[in-house]
Amino acid sequence: MGKPRGRKLLKKHHTEGEEASHVEPQPYDTNDTIPEKISSGSNGEPNTFFGVLDTQELEYFKQAESTLAVDTFENAEEKEQFISSVIEETKNKELKLATSQICSKLMERIILAGSNQQLKAIFRSFNGFFYGLACQKYSSHVLETLFVRGAAMVEKELLTPSFDEPGATEDGDDVYSPMEDLFLYMLNEITPSVRGMISHKYASHVFRLLILILSSKTLPSTTMSNSALRSKRSKIARKMIDLKDNEDFDKTYKTPDSFKVKLREILSSLYKELTGGVDLGSSNFKNISVTSMMKVRELCIDPVASPVLQLIIQVEGIFDRDRSFWHLIFSSSEEKNAKEEAFVEYLLSDPVGSHFLENVISFTRAKYTERLYKMYMRDRILKLSKRDLTGAFVVQALLKHLRQNDVKSILNDIVPELSLIVNSNMEFCISILDASIQHGDYLKEEIVLQLIKKFYPEGLEDRNILESCLSLNSSTLGNTRDDWPTAEERRRSLFLEKLIDYDDRFLNITIESLLALPEERLLQMCYHGVFSHVVEHVLQVKRVDKIKRKRLLNVFCTDIVNLSCNAYGSHLVDKLWDFTAQLPMYKERIATSMAGDSEKVKNSVYGRQAWKNWSMDKFLRKQFDWKRLIREQQQELFPDATPLQPGGDAGTKRKGDKPSYNRPEKKFRR
């Protein structure tokens, strides 16, 4: 991924030393400050100055941004009027606002909330300066927001022919151009500069977004932790300033055919620059010089350019069946190449390089992945698996995308050492479990024995999988400082839940470990934001025998009201509705506990939900209907079991049992 966007910018480091081409700006009709001509600085970046706002203007726009952030308008019409008045004030100042730390947030809010015609007007105001804006810290974010909303409008105009009717802007000018044309004009402007954009810490983000739009891929959210576009620091900062995406983000949009043509044109131009004038196509691979290939390989391990190349390799199949960019990086020969072998080895040992290789083998054709695996990785899979921060991620990708025989070969190498590998890489172990399941529980018995040997070894009196897997003693469990659960605790909990799903032995081991804990400790887990999921995960009525179910229920029933009123415990109480199937005494015991403190339960948001899920109103007023629900539940969960007998647990009737008689139900007095 690219470097996080920070305040103190390091001097731009160019891998190849080539100066990025630039676009001549169009005249900008403003009475305030005319931007200087875009020129290349000493490091190849555009050196554009758009001017600064005076104190009065800055104060006005700061206040406008605060007003939009608070969003206390009485109705939508009032908000529209306010936005229109602010846009009127931004006339001829759009470039200044976009490059300002404070006012760029205002521009984003206007773009997100403005009308379609206002959006087009802002788009037109940036004409001639898109490359310069893309290379600036704050305006690059403005462009990303503008392009996402623009992509949504392109789809609307494409699907609704009447949607692109001309509309009047505030200054009386008609906007006749559809958004598709505005996009194509902008793309023509930045095409000569794409070589510089892929290596630029800010412009690379804009270029990646444009590739996603042109290829009709999902446009990522700017705040999601797994967003494919923004850096980690950028996503955190966006959450802190409370700048939320609208409904246009995290979607895939239909685009016109002209966008696919333009995508080919842009990437073909980039390919020529990277190869010294060679065209796309397999017939031209022989004309690529070794020097060009080495320079592109250097970009693959560059923190900024690497994600761009990953995305290009992902989408190049749309317009190029020969996968020219792939063959610009990797050879197509069936014989080993010393330079390629050294390059692959570097990728497998470098954090950026391993991330690149992990992603590209997930997108490319299976035969290309198989070639790299068989030539450079097959004979040392175990060694690569022990590289926790690099090679192990590539092996995980291989387990997902290789053919069955190759996956089984990898498992044969790794499983005997699984108890050692899991010490430092639980995510890798989850991938091994998934691969085993996908291929018919391959080596399941050996995997289970290896993991039991690690987490629940025989011969130890105090063995407990909760301690060996979750590290309870060193966790945030029971802390009085209201510490948030850590990421490590989440990873360990998810791993244990995966083991529970994988084999019944892990389920039984986990239940035994839970019952071995002091009662207070077990209840603390029920109130923990992460460990409560583990407790909830063992409540699988069809996989747990009655004796263990009763032992667990004896603990839960001691604090059922507080559990019902807790954000995490209430989910556990919901699960107990099914977990008490065939155990009507425990079901009534839980319902009676909630009914006995109904005021507390009903006054809690979570308690009300638990009350509803347990049908407590029927329990209090229509017990016959409530018991009918119990019988229906049992019939659904255990269709082959003996029907529930009044006054006792369901089960097989034993010889010598006395007949039971139905007693009249007690009616609650009004």
Curated annotation (Swiss-Prot):
Residues 651-670 have a biased composition (Basic and acidic residues). InterPro entries: ARM-like, ARM-type_fold, NOP9, Pumilio_RNA-bd_rpt. GO terms for biological process: endonucleolytic cleavage in 5'-ETS of tricistronic rRNA transcript (SSU-rRNA, 5.8S rRNA, LSU-rRNA); endonucleolytic cleavage in ITS1 to separate SSU-rRNA from 5.8S rRNA and LSU-rRNA from tricistronic rRNA transcript (SSU-rRNA, 5.8S rRNA, LSU-rRNA); endonucleolytic cleavage to generate mature 5'-end of SSU-rRNA from (SSU-rRNA, 5.8S rRNA, LSU-rRNA); ribosomal small subunit export from nucleus. Residues 28-46 have a biased composition (Polar residues). Keywords: Nucleus, Repeat, Ribosome biogenesis, rRNA processing. Residues 1-46, 637-670 are annotated as: Disordered. Pumilio repeats lie at residues 89-124, 125-160, 189-225, 289-331, 339-374, 376-412, 517-554, 555-592. GO terms for molecular function: RNA binding. Residues 1-14 have a biased composition (Basic residues). The keyword Cytoplasm does not apply. It is found in: Nucleus, Nucleolus. The keyword rRNA processing applies. Disulfide bonds: none annotated. SMART domains: Pumilio. One of its GO terms (cellular component) is nucleolus. It comes from the Eukaryota. Belongs to the NOP9 family. RNA-binding nucleolar protein required for pre-rRNA processing. Involved in production of 18S rRNA and assembly of small ribosomal subunit. This is Nucleolar protein 9.
